Amino acid sequence: MKLIIISGRSGSGKSVALRALEDLGYYCVDNIPVNLLPTLTHTVVDEYDQVAVSIDVRNLPKNPDDLVEILDYLPSSWSMTIVYIDASDDVLVKRFSETRRLHPLAKLNKSLSEAIRAESALLAPIAERADLYLDTDKLTIHQLAELIRERILGKKSSRLVLVFESFGFKHGIPKDADYVFDARFLPNPHWEPDLKHLTGLDAPVEVFLGSQPVVTKFIWQIQNLITTWLPHLERNNRSYVTVAIGCTGGQHRSVYIAQTLSKTFSEIHPDVQIRHRELNQ
């Protein structure tokens, strides 16, 4: 099992890092008490092979030595990486001031600056054990997410799921669509008596539409658009991109085009899904 522990001072970007790992398929737990870490990992070991947890100052044991013992208690067969995320005191003060959030140690009657410095001392034991230290002073949220993927996982892009969906305009446009293409101008198998009761998944309809130059060109242009911009979408912290193809009823043209595109992209992209909305109802 691969275990990633995210820690660092409040406001440094721990939540952003954890979300980036969740998008990559990690089972994530936010702000787990350290003394429950062995129990959690033993509980999920049979269900998940990639687990990420975040630990903040509120969940540390009172005795710093206990932290070392807890981490050492974890099975040596597990691959554990500790990531410590931090920023300068001035930047953390600015972030708290802009968001008007209350620092976790503010209840100790400390000023914001004092709380930030005190937090650093309390987190020192886990910072000393860190395998990777990330300074977020000059990073945006998206840059931090990309850095997490690149430094920890050895890849700049998350596993973006590319979804092709067919639909009928008379039933409404899918609300989750990122791109919508209108195929209603293309030759319609509905008006062919032998094809009317078939769908875009049936061979006779595939032959009919595949022999139409305008259909072939339409598919090629969609394919070219998605191929051009897919790398940029992957680097933009996206988990899903849904490409919706619509015709009048969602039975022939849109089904054929969505199915054709999904087959093409399955050869060049690791995670492609296909949905035929009207056929599944």
Curated annotation (Swiss-Prot):
<dbReference type="Pfam" id="PF03668">
    <property type="entry name" value="RapZ-like_N"/>
</dbReference>
<feature type="binding site">
    <location>
        <begin position="8"/>
        <end position="15"/>
    </location>
    <ligand>
        <name>ATP</name>
    </ligand>
</feature>
<dbReference type="GO" id="GO:0005524">
    <property type="term" value="F:ATP binding"/>
</dbReference>
<dbReference type="InterPro" id="IPR005337">
    <property type="entry name" value="RapZ-like"/>
</dbReference>
<keyword id="KW-0547">Nucleotide-binding</keyword>
<comment type="similarity">
    <text>Belongs to the RapZ-like family.</text>
</comment>
<dbReference type="GO" id="GO:0005525">
    <property type="term" value="F:GTP binding"/>
</dbReference>
<dbReference type="InterPro" id="IPR027417">
    <property type="entry name" value="P-loop_NTPase"/>
</dbReference>
<keyword id="KW-0067">ATP-binding</keyword>
<dbReference type="Pfam" id="PF22740">
    <property type="entry name" value="PapZ_C"/>
</dbReference>
<dbReference type="InterPro" id="IPR053930">
    <property type="entry name" value="RapZ-like_N"/>
</dbReference>
<protein>
    <recommendedName>
        <fullName>Nucleotide-binding protein MADE_1004170</fullName>
    </recommendedName>
</protein>
<comment type="function">
    <text>Displays ATPase and GTPase activities.</text>
</comment>
<feature type="binding site">
    <location>
        <begin position="56"/>
        <end position="59"/>
    </location>
    <ligand>
        <name>GTP</name>
    </ligand>
</feature>
<keyword id="KW-0342">GTP-binding</keyword>
<dbReference type="InterPro" id="IPR053931">
    <property type="entry name" value="RapZ_C"/>
</dbReference>
